[in-house]
Amino acid sequence: MKKLFLFLILLFSFTAIVNAKGVQAKKYNHIVSLTLSGDEMLLGLIPENRIAGLSGKINGDKEISNIVDKAKKFPKVEGNEEVLISLEPDLIIVADWLTKRIDDIGTMTGAKVYIYKTPSSYEEQKKLIRDLANLVEEKENGEKIIKNMDNRLKALQNKIAKNYKGAKPRILLYTSFGTTSGKNTTFNDMVKLINGTNVVAEAGIDRFKDISKEKVIELNPDIIIVPIAKKYDNVDKISKLFYEDSSFKNVKAIKNKKVYFMQYKDITPISQYMIDGIEELAKVVYQFKE
């Protein structure tokens, strides 16, 4: 009986040591993300058992999120302080644009708060993934993600070079709210990476701005990209804004019927899914088949 008791103690001790090495070896094991992009990056970098909670219902919206199924199993913070505290996080991931009460989050929870700079280019996105991977001690996974992105981008650029010999397509982003993306935006970088020209950036317009109908006519793009969320936007109605307005009739994109609609998640990804967006943009611009 004593031998059995001693064996059980040793077995318990060994199991505790193994668990400590396997799970507690990492500095942060109750990580919470407060943004969709943070959710997407964390789920790509770390095991699910190190995630205590994710941003909210936005990650369940298939029009915007790339992680609809993966995100279902995690508590959703939704900016609720009580929920955040109850999750007992040791690390909170938050974007620099989410400034409300950031200074108080660490005090309320006792957690480290990591505020990341929102990327405005492909290279900045890779740097963020690398920095976050180092923070959560998943450097190898971070490098795998980056390598996958770079390999896919190289293959895409080779495909474009092989199959398209014309002038650089001149592209305009135009939202249903009448806004556009110029210099220092991920969209501008995505366009450059597929050998296109963002006509708004070319005109010297910076960041996100309203754009008038007159300016669209002046810029005369070859292609107009309209980001949409199908459950919110009426594609037919938006199409009529272009094709039934006689003032647009000489704009190349309208004349040649090259107004294309793309999901928001393919135009505005701030995570490793940026490469998916770049591939989708190229598919639309160059009309690549599957």
Give each language-model segment a name.
Residues 29-30, 34, 123-136, 143, ...:
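Structured C-terminal subdomain patch of bacterial secreted/periplasmic proteins
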Residues 18-25:
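Boundary at the C-terminal end of the N-terminal hydrophobic targeting segment
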Residues 30-87, 91-97, 101, 196-199:
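A short, structured surface patch at a secondary-structure boundary
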